[in-house]
Amino acid sequence: MKFLDETKVYIRSGDGGAGAVSFHREKFIEFGGPDGGDGGRGGDVWVEAVNGLNTLIDFRYQQHFKGKTGVHGMGRNRTGAKGADVTLKVPVGTQIFEEDNETLIVDMVAEGQRYRLAAGGNGGFGNAHFKSSTNQAPNWANPGLEGEEKTIWLRLKLIADAGLVGLPNAGKSTFLAACTRARPKIANYPFTTLHPNLGVATVDGREFIIADIPGLIEGAHEGVGIGDRFLGHVERTRVLLHLVSAQEEDVAKAYTTVRHELDAYGGGLEDKPQIVALSQVDVLDDDELKAKSKALAKACGSTPLIISAVTNRGMTEALRALRDVISAAKAGEEQA
C-alpha cells in the first residue's frame, strides 16, 4: 500500500429541505387550514478515527465529500427526513487543519473518536408555521438553509510507542524487520525507506509498536529531504531508539547531526527519552568496536547499546530497554 501523510479535501454539508406550502383538504371541510410541514436538516460531514489504517492514500482518489440534502416538507404537517451524513474515515493520529494548514481543528487520537466538521443546513419552515390571527392561510414557506462548505487539510502523525531515528543507512529498517513482522524495503543505499513503517514488537510477552521513519539528514527540521514531515511521525512516541551505524567513519558526528535535528525541530522531541545504540556492529573487529563505542559514549553521555540485527546481537536487550521506558511512561500517564 502506498503511503500518504498529508492531503487536501473539500467538504460540504447538505442543504436543508424546503418547507411545504399545503392546505388541509378533507370532505365537508371547506376551508382547511395550512398544513405544510418543515423541511429536513441537511446531512452533516463527520470525521472518524479507525484502526487498521496507517495512510491517507484513499483521499488521493476522492477529495470531495458532500452530505445529502434534507427531504422537503410535505402536506399533513409532515417534516422531511434528514439528509444522509457522510463520514471521512481516517487513521488514528490524523490531525485536521483549516485551509491555511496551520489552524488545528481537531486531533484524532483515539479509535472511534468522531467530530462534526460541517453541520447540515436547517430545513425551511412550512406554511403551517406562519399561520396567525391576521393571516389564516399563508401561501409561502421558507427554503432550506445552505450547508457549510470548506477546504480542510488532513495530516497524519503516526501513533507508535517507540520511534527509530538515525541517518540514512543506519540499519533502522533492518532492525524493524528483525524484531517485528513488518517487511520494509531494505537495501544498501541511502534513503531506501521513503515513508514511515510500523511494526509490532514482542519481548517477554509484552507488545509495543515501533515506527521506522526515513533517515534524517542535516537540515531535516527545515524540511530538507522533507525531514520535517518525517519528524512529525515520532512526535507522539514515548521513546526514541537512536541508531548510529558502526560503518560511519565518525560516529560522534553522526550522532550529533541527528540529535541537532531533533532538538531544532521541537515538538517535544528535544525532551523525549532516547536510547542510543551502535548498530551494524557485525562489520567491526573487537578493537574497532571498542573505539567506536567509546567515541559514541562520549558524544551522547551514556553507554550505547551494541546491536546487530543480522546476527541478533543485543536485539533482546534493546527491546527490553524500550519496553521499560514505555511501561514507565504509560504508568506516569495513568497517574496524571
Swiss-Prot record:
Where along this sequence does the record place binding of Mg(2+)?
Answer: 173, 193
Q: What cystine pairs are annotated?
A: none
* Pfam families for the chain: GTP1_OBG, MMR_HSR1
Q: Which residues form the OBG-type G domain?
A: 160-327
Q: Which residues bind GTP?
A: 166-173, 191-195, 212-215, 279-282, 308-310
Where is this protein localized, as stated in its record?
Answer: Cytoplasm
Residue intervals of the Obg domain? 1-159
How does this chain assemble? Monomer.
Which HAMAP family does this chain map to?
Answer: GTPase_Obg
Q: What is this protein called?
A: GTPase Obg
| Organism this protein belongs to | Sinorhizobium fredii (strain NBRC 101917 / NGR234)
What lineage does the source organism belong to? Bacteria, Pseudomonadati, Pseudomonadota, Alphaproteobacteria, Hyphomicrobiales
Name of the encoding gene: obg
